[in-house]
Amino acid sequence: MSLADLRAALDAELAATPEYYDFKVLRSEREGALWRVTLEPGYVFAEGQPPGQAAALGLLDDSLDGASAWWGAPVKGHASVLALRLEEDQLLLQNASSAPPGPEQLIRLYPPRFLKALVEAAWDTPWAEAALALRPALSRPEAAPPGPALSGAPFRWLREAQRRALQTLPTQRCGYLWGPPGTGKTTTLGVLLAEYLDSRPTARILLVSATNQAVDQALIAVDKALQKGRREALRGALQRLGTRFDPAAYEGREHLLPGSDPALLATLSRVEAARPRSGDAQALKAWSDRLAGLREQQRADTRRALRQARLAAMTASRATAGLGLLRSLDERGAGEPPFDLLVFDEASQLSLAQTLLLMPLGAAALFAGDPQQLAPVLRSREPAAQRWLGRSAFADMPHQGPSVVLLDEQSRMAPPICALVSEVFYEGALKVATDALQTPEWLARRQRPLADLPAADHVIVRPVKGPGRWSAQDHGPQRPASAEAVVEAVALALESGTWQPRELVVLTPFRAQRALIRRGLEARGIAEAEGVRVSTVHRAQGSEAPVVFFDPVDAKLPFLQTQDARRLLNVALSRAQAKVLLYLSDADAASPLLAPLVQRLRLADDRRAVIPLQVLAAAPAFPRNALGLRVSAGRVTGEVQRLSPDGRQLWLVNERNGAALPLDAAFWRAKAGLAS
């Protein structure tokens, strides 16, 4: 893939990304110097797109973190988005020049255009060529120069794979820390980086991640590891860059936060929004000069913080937008990377293009995440955009070797849930941690009855009758029958008195179904504020709960036919600690997305004798004589589910992962003949 191909991909994605979104306001409430604005769920008009179903797909999401807000009524005003509460459809605004709009009025959001920063980097030909030259290192990593070994001695509780990550990944120029759900990926990363800083007194690290929340979690994990390892002197060398962090997460860890002048940030926001008319040349020149001065002052503050920090943490978007500043840290101008180690956390959510264009900043790179969970967000359908922006660096990850460490022990899911997730999504590599299985309290928390379900049942399919529909009110797909069933199940669990609201989570791929379920719970007197969380699956990564209720709504919808949907299903199932309930229609159960899971559950306890397929193939009635039987074909054991009309093919459902494997009848006849 060439530089021209990369540039074409970025241009295609830029063209597919709206300049602004208009949302309808439900209410605006003042909170001190801030404003909390609640939006009407599902109502959005995206610039350049017709209103309706297509526009409704461009809903409030992480791409609007850091957006600029503007409104024309009741009084024209502007503000910046300090934070998003996506599950509540809320914005938290700062530096508002007037009161935000009220009910039924519109607020316009201009998303940060980090894509423009990527385009600028791609058109910096020497930099872009240096970035593309690193592409082969992703799939064929080389050894890094020798350095101190990381022992992890202060952390005796590390599991085997976690300890292997410390020992091998720092020895590679490109390393992959693959952390499936519940395996302690963030904790492992925190320990690894704490050990790295301690063993290399002059080393500098840049830590980037996909979202502000992920940056906060990773940085705090490093700080905790330094604290637990009694390396207090190093804690002051960690620095969070950016203004959109969660202050509550840093209680007791204020030393991590930036020292930027709040007054400078507020002034900068006001000046940026006060651009004069283009016809007034003198006013425009004065405005431009003042803005340039303020931005230079801000850059100086940031540059000072970066030079003082040994580990700087920020979002990948901020790193991309500030690429020039980060490059300037190569103070000798020798073209050397300014950081010894560049860490991409939640790397599966960062595009290959963005990753490569940041990689020259580090002498070595470490990718932490899970390619079987959420992928980069992509709007363009152009093939070039799919190649560069729809995939992450994990697409080039080697299958094995010292550069890849799979954390294979998890302590979240009960064994049957873990087995299902492991076989369907991780080829059987994921297992329950030995220390968890040896802990009676851990086992007891995962052996609890739920209404009519015994404690020993962990994965349950609830049949659903009733069609789905498109909701004009909620701007998305809904299925009333499954919503009612979920509401009833939650109500019964709470009425039993053995479950607390915070222990129950409802997940669905669609916001419209989320809204319908929320209204159903409210009608039963169950308010979400009391603890029962109803969420889209997209927002659930990183969370967990004892019980998960999953409602796919309609598996025939185009979105649920994609590879992204498979990743969402993994996220949904792997949030559950004790039980996961799936609400499926017959059509859902037969869909490409869910059929393997349903078949795996059906065959999991099959105790029938296994007949070698080769034996059946020797009979004249083959392959009809194999239909419905439990057979073995090579290393695969399962049930012959169906035959082709002409009898030339048969499909064997693998009882380990539920996948249907096509087999050639003539091949097996020949194999049986040779054996005889």
Spell out what each predicted region is.
Residues 35, 647-651:
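Short aromatic-glycine-enriched beta-strand elements
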Residues 136-255, 307-431, 588:
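ASCE P-loop NTPase helicase motor core
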